[in-house]
Amino acid sequence: MAAEEEEVDSADTGERSGWLTGWLPTWCPTSISHLKEAEEKMLKCVPCTYKKEPVRISNGNKIWTLKFSHNISNKTPLVLLHGFGGGLGLWALNFGDLCTNRPVYAFDLLGFGRSSRPRFDSDAEEVENQFVESIEEWRCALGLDKMILLGHNLGGFLAAAYSLKYPSRVNHLILVEPWGFPERPDLADQDRPIPVWIRALGAALTPFNPLAGLRIAGPFGLSLVQRLRPDFKRKYSSMFEDDTVTEYIYHCNVQTPSGETAFKNMTIPYGWAKRPMLQRIGKMHPDIPVSVIFGARSCIDGNSGTSIQSLRPHSYVKTIAILGAGHYVYADQPEEFNQKVKEICDTVD
């Protein structure tokens, strides 16, 4: 369904510098216009009206935002934070159900999608703080008092980090297959040690961003996404029969690698967090309820919910498993996911 309004074409793309980023537009068949068109295709089947706008924050940056049912004033708004390599368009299967009786906001994280793509610090703690402050500035700009904050993957990590720093703004924290919670296990403690060749490959790739290969592939990048992740087309088959989803993912991830670089600076080899959230979540304000949603078929460690419960013994923590779902639980089983999220939201108001 078409948006009700759009104030400007898009958020700024941020700085481009160096020979590589200057060369990318001529090698990769992409542009901000391509990303805009891909997003519009993702959203055209959303069965409800919405408004979209770039929300201005500090340093000239903008956060690309969708607003659903924003005129409902008696319910706490639900705010959706996407994961690494994603964008707000990936919630297309969820918007219609989630906004039936409360405001829903979704935005592209700073450095991702159609939000600004600034330079991030190289220090993991400072990068995390830059993300958190961008969320807080976004909240202030929209005049939201309190939120139900839901994050998937990297978005879950950032939602938890935000809740630690700004507890008075979060009425409920919903972690969906969150990244970055456990510490990296010692190699000697692993049941199946990482093969030497994988460790060598990991060391060789350390200087590069996680999705650099997609940009290096240039005009072959889109077919690479389609070949490596055919599951995304299947997940959204009820909404799209063509390659809309893989095209959106491709154009999200071959722009200037701003958020991607930030994520790399927050990780150690093999994708573990430099600053694991389980080391800190016990310090979260005890009055913030936490719900953890994971897919029963996910390859990601699903024990974070149990760990959070043990670290917050006197606070509300609930773990919910979605049968038949993997890591992208909101797309694998959207109806069940939407229902569980609505039930959680109804406990707030």
Curated annotation (Swiss-Prot):
Acyltransferase activity is inhibited by detergents such as Triton X-100 and 3-[(3-cholamidopropyl)dimethylammonio]-1-propanesulfonate (CHAPS). Acyltransferase activity is inhibited by the presence of magnesium and calcium. Its EC number is 2.3.1.51. GO terms for cellular component: cytosol; intracellular membrane-bounded organelle; lipid droplet; mitochondrion; nucleoplasm. Widely expressed in various tissues, including lymphocytes, liver, skeletal muscle and brain. Expressed by upper epidermal layers and dermal fibroblasts in skin, hepatocytes and neurons (at protein level). This is 1-acylglycerol-3-phosphate O-acyltransferase ABHD5. Signal peptide: none annotated. The modification Phosphoserine is found at residue 122. The HXXXXD motif is essential for acyltransferase activity and may constitute the binding site for the phosphate moiety of the glycerol-3-phosphate. Induction: Up-regulated upon keratinocyte differentiation (at protein level). It is linked to Chanarin-Dorfman syndrome: An autosomal recessive inborn error of lipid metabolism with multisystemic accumulation of triglycerides although plasma concentrations are normal. Clinical characteristics are congenital generalized ichthyosis, vacuolated leukocytes, hepatomegaly, myopathy, cataracts, neurosensory hearing loss and developmental delay. The disorder presents at birth with generalized, fine, white scaling of the skin and a variable degree of erythema resembling non-bullous congenital ichthyosiform erythroderma. A motif (HXXXXD motif) lies at residues 327-332. The gene is ABHD5. It is found in: Cytoplasm; Lipid droplet; Cytoplasm, Cytosol. Interacts with ADRP, PLIN and PNPLA2. Interacts with PLIN5; promotes interaction with PNPLA2. It is an enzyme of class 2 (transferase). Coenzyme A-dependent lysophosphatidic acid acyltransferase that catalyzes the transfer of an acyl group on a lysophosphatidic acid. Functions preferentially with 1-oleoyl-lysophosphatidic acid followed by 1-palmitoyl-lysophosphatidic acid, 1-stearoyl-lysophosphatidic acid and 1-arachidonoyl-lysophosphatidic acid as lipid acceptor. Functions preferentially with arachidonoyl-CoA followed by oleoyl-CoA as acyl group donors. Functions in phosphatidic acid biosynthesis. May regulate the cellular storage of triacylglycerol through activation of the phospholipase PNPLA2. Gene3D superfamilies: alpha/beta hydrolase. InterPro entries: AB_hydrolase_1 (IPR000073), AB_hydrolase_fold (IPR029058). It catalyses: a 1-acyl-sn-glycero-3-phosphate + an acyl-CoA = a 1,2-diacyl-sn-glycero-3-phosphate + CoA; 1-(9Z-octadecenoyl)-sn-glycero-3-phosphate + hexadecanoyl-CoA = 1-(9Z)-octadecenoyl-2-hexadecanoyl-sn-glycero-3-phosphate + CoA; 1-(9Z-octadecenoyl)-sn-glycero-3-phosphate + octadecanoyl-CoA = 1-(9Z-octadecenoyl)-2-octadecanoyl-sn-glycero-3-phosphate + CoA; 1-(9Z-octadecenoyl)-sn-glycero-3-phosphate + (9Z)-octadecenoyl-CoA = 1,2-di-(9Z-octadecenoyl)-sn-glycero-3-phosphate + CoA. GO terms for biological process: cell differentiation; fatty acid metabolic process; lipid homeostasis; negative regulation of triglyceride storage; phosphatidic acid biosynthetic process; positive regulation of triglyceride catabolic process. Pfam families: Abhydrolase_1. The modification N-acetylalanine is found at residue 2. GO terms for molecular function: 1-acylglycerol-3-phosphate O-acyltransferase activity; carboxylic ester hydrolase activity; lipase activator activity; lysophosphatidic acid acyltransferase activity. It comes from Homo sapiens (Human). The lineage of its organism: Eukaryota, Metazoa, Chordata, Craniata, Vertebrata.
